[in-house]
Amino acid sequence: MQQGYQLDDRPYGRPEQLDYPQTGPSPGAVPGRYGTPSDQLQLNAAQSVDNLSRNSPFADPHQRGPYQTDYAVNPEAHHDAYYNQPYEPTPMEGTPLGYDPGQPGYDHDDLRPMLPHQDSHASEPYQDQPTPQGAGGGIKRWKTVKQVLLYRGNLVLDCPVPPRLLNQLPHGERDEFTHMRYSAATCDPDHFYEENFTLRQRLFSKPRHTELFIVVTMYNEDEILFARSMIGVFKNIEYMCNRKESKTWGKDAWKKIVVCVVSDGRSKINPRTRALLAGMGVYQEGIAKQQVNGKDVTSHIYEYTTQVGMRIEKGVVQLVPKQQPVQILFCLKEKNQKKINSHRWFFSAFGRVLDPNICVLLDAGTKPGGNSIYHLWKAFDLEPMCAGACGEIKAMLGTGGKNLLNPLIATQNFEYKMSNILDKPLESAFGFISVLPGAFSAYRYVALQNDKKGQGPLEKYFAGETLHGSDAGIFESNMYLAEDRILCFELVTKRNCHWILQYVKSATGETDVPDTVTELVLQRRRWLNGSFFAAIYAIAHFYQFFRSDHSFLRKVMLFIEFIFHTINMVFAWFAVGNFFLVFSILTKSLGGDELLGRTGEILGVVFTWLYGVALFTCFVLSMGNRPSGSRWYYTTMVYFWAIIMVYLMFAAIFIAVKAIMADVNDGTPFSLGELFRNPVFYTLIVSVMSTYGIWFLASFLMFDPWHMFTSFVQYMLLTPTYINILNVYAFCNTHDISWGTKGDDQAEKLPSVSTKDGSGKTDLPDESDLNAQYERELTAFGSKPIKVVHTPTEAQRAEAQMDYYRGVRSITVLAWMITNFGLAAVVLSAAGLDRIDPKHQTAEEEDPNARANIYMTVVLWSVAGLAAFKFIGAMWFLVVRMFRGV
């Protein structure tokens, strides 16, 4: 146990009972469960449900009444449950009550206040005005107009949770369980701290240290996807609370963990997901405000320590009693401003207030394993210079692997597995992982910070949010398509630092993968373009490795890895051309007299024409059609490319078998060495089987070979789809830098709060409505959405930006097409190149396929060599992992 942390709840106080609306003790209160004095959290309510006698100007604000009467949630007794005292996050000068941290009594004084208040009294406590009963039925409604005191214009409300929920909760005597805190942020996330906003963890009498800060970002995901992620997070928190022998974790580990849910746009959040948050006690309808003191609210922040768990039964989310508390911070952004802005709220606003040790990033729908977050944290604990880590992303295969029946899911499963078996371990062995996936990764907060000049990883990470078209270069304007890759590069190359990145095999996260062609095309457009521009960025800034404080050996290793990534990028650039060359060489070879003869020549011509038509169709559809509107075209092309791949595999096997038979029947004694000297067998079989053999061997050594049996064939058949359809669509849409969502969506208009001399009036729902709000969610507001009128200058700026990106797109596609066409023409001696050089014509007459065969040999063996390099790195990763433990 760390010195100064009190892990027992209220060891020196008397157990308190909640005054529930029914007689008898609360069914949610746990007898003998006490509250820790350091966990005392005074409400921001001068006229609150807490000891109304203390609302007098002559009352001692530091004196607590009897525990049995601390709270009353009877709506007939108190209509001013929402009244809030001024929000003053500035701690008092000096040490409260004369105690210094570490001295006896620092953690054990029940009378020590949370924060001092200079003025807690309002001139007009409340006035209740009954309003006509609504059409909904017999619920007594009150329009409660309250006097609200603001601190420097900040509106903060402590709202009691619905009694129906409160009756189910243990620890009901503590404020963090009985009240939900709402803050109306009216500033940019970068100014959240300077505007004197704070969070609950800093307001306890002894502020809580945040060891793990977990963010779940969402847009319009349904309640199933959201619950899937939250169930995984809750299981991890429970796992850490059960580690009773740990120096960091233990019974009260939940106090060191904060779960932040950031929803991108109030008008975009799924109503069922919002209702689920309300069921957990985190969200309440009717609290949010549109403006505060003339300032537009940018984010609605709800804080609550929930004890409500959930499970998914037959496709329905069910709330269940949860004994393990979880501190939840729900940030509902007013506008849809993309995921990178959600991360800016997480890092720049909330992270600066809480100053966490480790930050974990999750996408809604990604379910971490039961102890995966702990294993991520452990990697940082074991390696002080670890700046970032990621786990294994798994494709969600369904019960019994039923989703593998879909070839697209099986192909992505194979792709994910091989990346986690070869690519990630190799990069981890060098210390630089090119991308830590935002769906499931973790960072050390201190490593992310910028320097005194404001330059650093976070500055680069958020740069793309404010860049505009022609005002920026090609690298900067496309940076945020690969912001996670840029962040990884900036961390490892951070000036005067020697941070490294690690892959943690023990940490896993399951995620849904696209199950239709159109969804896959749209997803990979951003992925491929992001990785392409990130690779260009890394190549253009490779020298920044040398500004870091890494050792000479580490810099050499990073330089080798940089060369490896450069070679991979070259192969990715020429992937379309290389695939066509292999296709052309093999189909022409089948026309030989010793193979299929005239039949092979006819098949070669037919398939070549079909190949050209399909590739041309890909370009036409990619330049203007939406994939969702061309679904049948894309599906047809997937089947066609699969047929092409079957034909290629047949050609390779048939040619190799014929070559072996020729060696056997040539009249000389057959030997294995002679077989390997056969150029056809050596080029086709040995090189290709070396690549596939390395895949099998590495999978078995990682004790994860099943994808080789369930997904390998599907991956082989859909390889041409990845090369032609996905690459073509991605390059033809490099001008589209969107995430698939539009910004500046207008939500329903909310009430506003205006102030004068630091106080003002606002309408708040009466406590008698809480149960009704808890049972149902409002679906509409009376006022219409606010229409944004764009000035001509803004429209011209947006059009200029799109023109710039279209120009970048045109240049990129032209360069890509010309270079790939040129490669094919040179290798195949086509497009009239054979008539330019007379010497070349003579060589072509002797062996027309010599150049093509040499090139195919180089390509196939290069692929095998890259696979072998990955295998060596993966084996080194396994050796290090044996000693490291995670």
UniProtKB/Swiss-Prot annotation:
Per its UniProt entry, what is the enzyme's top EC class, as one word? Answer: transferase
Q: How does it sit in the membrane?
A: Multi-pass membrane protein
Q: Where are the transmembrane segments?
A: 428-448, 526-546, 556-576, 602-622, 637-657, 683-703, 712-732, 813-833, 858-878
Q: Which Pfam families match?
A: Chitin_synth_1, Chitin_synth_1N
Report the leader peptide range.
none
Q: Where in the cell is it found?
A: Cell membrane
Spell out the Basic and acidic residues composition-biased ranges: 7-17, 106-122
Where is there biased composition of kind Polar residues? 37-56
- EC no. given is 2.4.1.16
Supply the CDD domains for this chain.
Answer: Chitin_synth_C
Instruction: Give the record's GO biological process terms.
Output: ascospore wall assembly; chitin biosynthetic process; septum digestion after cytokinesis
User: What terms describe the molecular function in GO for this protein?
Assistant: chitin synthase activity
Q: Does the keyword Ligase apply?
A: no
Keywords, sorted A to Z: Cell membrane, Cell wall biogenesis/degradation, Glycoprotein, Glycosyltransferase, Membrane, Transferase, Transmembrane, Transmembrane helix
Described purpose of this protein according to its UniProt entry: Polymerizes chitin, a structural polymer of the cell wall and septum, by transferring the sugar moiety of UDP-GlcNAc to the non-reducing end of the growing chitin polymer. Involved in tolerance to hyperosmotic conditions. CHS3 is the only V.dahliae chitin synthase that is not involved in virulence.
Its family remark reads: Belongs to the chitin synthase family. Class I subfamily.
**What is the protein's name according to its record?**
Chitin synthase 3
Gene that encodes the chain: CHS3
